[in-house]
Amino acid sequence: MVYFLGIGGIGMSALARYFKANGYEVAGYDRTQSPLTQRLETEGISVHYVDDPAMIPENIDFCVLTPAIPADSKELNYLRDKNVKIVKRAEVLGMLSRQHNSIAIGGTHGKTTTTALVTHILMTAGKKLSAFIGGIARNIDSNVVIGDANDECVVMEADEFDHSFLQLSPYVSVVTSIDADHLDIYGDYQHVVDSFNEFVNKTSDDGLVVYHADLPINTDKKHITYGLENADVIAENICVNQGETCFNIKIAVDDCWEDNNLRYLRDLRELKMSLYGNHNVQNALAAVIVSTYLGVNEADIRRGLATFKGVQRRFDIRVKNTRHIYIDDYAHHPEEIKAALSAARKVFSDKELTVVFQPHLFTRTRDFMDGFAESLSLADRVILLDIYPARELPIDGVTSAALLDKITSKNKMLCSKNELLDIIKGIDPELIMTVGAGDIDRFVPQIEKMLAQ
């Protein structure tokens, strides 16, 4: 029996399903019921929602713990008193990363989409693999691909929170971005950079480090950079045509990496995908490099890009009709919001943009108040919900009202959850985005239903 404390998280639920598929009995606790936990229950995994040691099954082999579980958890302390083996989620992923050639994809932003895209291209090419994705990939309607002992590789999202990705031993490591985030853990930006450098330097000596050319990565490992300029692999001629993003890839260095599959990297023209935004073009560059290194040919790369449907809550177009366009996005950092709103502005340039934002964490809102205000001001209308606290207590002076004061959009307002649907109905928006990492996603089905009519 494998027991999960915090089984409803996107990463924990993937591991729970992996162990269940590999013949283990699985059970777990989470604070609240969600679509993820409901899905686990339909798959035969027992989940309860009360922090009560009496509800823990007997005969547990080990417990998998998420960092989100507080130190005063009754169940956690009960298991410790009983000397049950407790391992962090990252330790389990670390173990799996050592059993197969692992592709670990990290970055403060972009890692989930890139992980899902690499997984999809490899599956398109017929590769045998397992994958652990930090979101629901639309092509497979899942956050996990369950392989077997014959897997050629395992693709995993590498989470920087709580230094989790330092447990991994990748064959290929990818870093999509490094911004100041999780400062409650790291303290400052330099410590974030140091941790990412420690991560890439855990890459095996015969492997590859792939990273965005703008990043302060320092490694002696074999590496390759990508970006829109000043990189080894560059995206050019980016445009949106008939609902698709089109771009070319140019190899900008003479070194053809003759000792490995990177020698097959070449200039590619007229690549197409359904994702929008320059940030997603750059995510695609990383995916193309990784896939080429793992032996995927050009035809399968083109087909994989063209058929990739994206990830839920990542520029997720939920409604597109003659009256309304509704996009849902997980963005919860100023740079992510800037990328998402800029993409919406570019693709739907003739529409007035309304954004509903739920700030996530008091510390993050405090640390990036000015950045949030600047990014949100890209919208014509801003509607702010209260800050979603997650694991935190309130901080004096850190409120949605304080953020609203700094936003320069002429049309802006505060809104309670109870008012949200009526306000959206009254606005009748032509282009609206819901943005945030809290529980704003609970409103998505209702907003979708209202605007789809």
Residue locations for each model-derived region?
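Conserved N-terminal Rossmann-fold NAD(P)-binding element of oxidoreductases
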Residues: 2-7, 435
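Nucleotide phosphate-binding/pyrophosphate-handling subdomain across enzymes
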Residues: 11, 15-18, 22, 255-381
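Phosphate-binding loop of NTP-binding sites
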Residues: 18-24, 41, 54-58, 67-222, ...
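N-terminal beta-loop-helix "entrance" segment that forms/cooperates
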Residues: 21, 29-48, 138-141, 396
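Short internal beta-strands
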Residues: 24-31, 209-213, 354-357, 380-389
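Beta-strand->loop->alpha-helix junctions that form or flank phosphate-binding loops
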Residues: 29-30, 48-51, 87-91, 132-134, ...
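Short acidic low-complexity segments
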Residues: 46-59, 416-424
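C-terminal helical cap/extension that packs against the catalytic core
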Residues: 373-430
